[in-house]
A protein has these predicted regions:
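HotDog/MaoC-like acyl-thioester-processing domains
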Residues: 1-4, 94-95, 106-162
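A generic structural signal for short beta-strands and their flanking turns/coil linkers
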Residues: 8-9, 21-23, 34-38, 79-85, ...
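A conserved, well-ordered hydrophobic junction motif at loop->secondary-structure transitions
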Residues: 37-61
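A structural signal for short, well-ordered beta-strand segments
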Residues: 38, 85-89, 103, 117, ...
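Glycine-centered flexibility sites
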Residues: 48-51, 55-56, 67, 96, ...
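Non-catalytic linker/capping segments at the edges of enzyme domains
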Residues: 1-45, 150, 155-162
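Hydrophobic beta-strand-centered segment that forms part of the acyl-chain substrate-binding groove
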Residues: 65-100, 131
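Short beta-strand micro-motifs enriched in acidic
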Residues: 28-30, 104-108
Length: 162
């Protein structure tokens, strides 16, 4: 199955390559499942209670993953921001464990979209999920990002992966 890697940012906490305290995650479009995916393992540096990933980190990963689902059509001009997000924590998410986050589009209205995301354990158990309302980023906001961020986005735009 071929997956298309999504672009990354320089500064973003979730995907930013130059963010020294960032998560440095990468997302891939899974066209067969109509979802975006990332796999990762979080160390105890990201815990709340011993052995449990902090809920704010989980919310961050859900926010980024569900938000990236709108880019499944490869139209990276459609980048959106979250207006509203509801997170449900179903089980503790353990540190030092391989995890998978997936995001899907529920409804796409052009400049607004409703998306969902979830974090899964290796056995498929969902530890947390979200539903979110997204809004298209105005061009005036993107214009303030500067050339370095724009160049990074262009440089990391999709390459087919096996």
């Amino acid at each position: 199955m071929k997956k298309l890697r999504q672009p990354t940012s320089l500064a973003c906490f979730a995907c930013g390559r130059k963010n020294p305290v960032g998560l440095h995650l990468e997302w891939f479009n899974n066209y067969e499942e109509k979802q975006v995916e990332t796999t990762f393992t979080l160390s105890d540096d990201y815990c709340s209670y011993p052995g449990t990933v902090h809920g704010g980190i989980i919310a961050t990963i859900l926010d980024e993953t569900s938000g990236r689902a709108i880019l499944l059509d490869n139209n990276f001009e459609r980048l959106m921001v979250t207006l509203k997000m509801e997170v449900v924590y179903k089980h503790n998410t353990p540190t030092n464990t391989p995890l998978k986050a997936i995001g899907r589009v529920l409804r796409d209205g052009g400049s607004r979209a409703q998306v969902e995301g979830e974090i899964q354990l290796p056995d498929g158990t969902v530890t947390a999920k979200c539903t979110s309302l997204l809004f298209k980023i105005p061009q005036a906001v993107k214009d303030k990002w500067g050339p370095a961020e724009t160049e990074e986005w262009a440089r990391t735009t999709p390459k087919l992966e096996e």
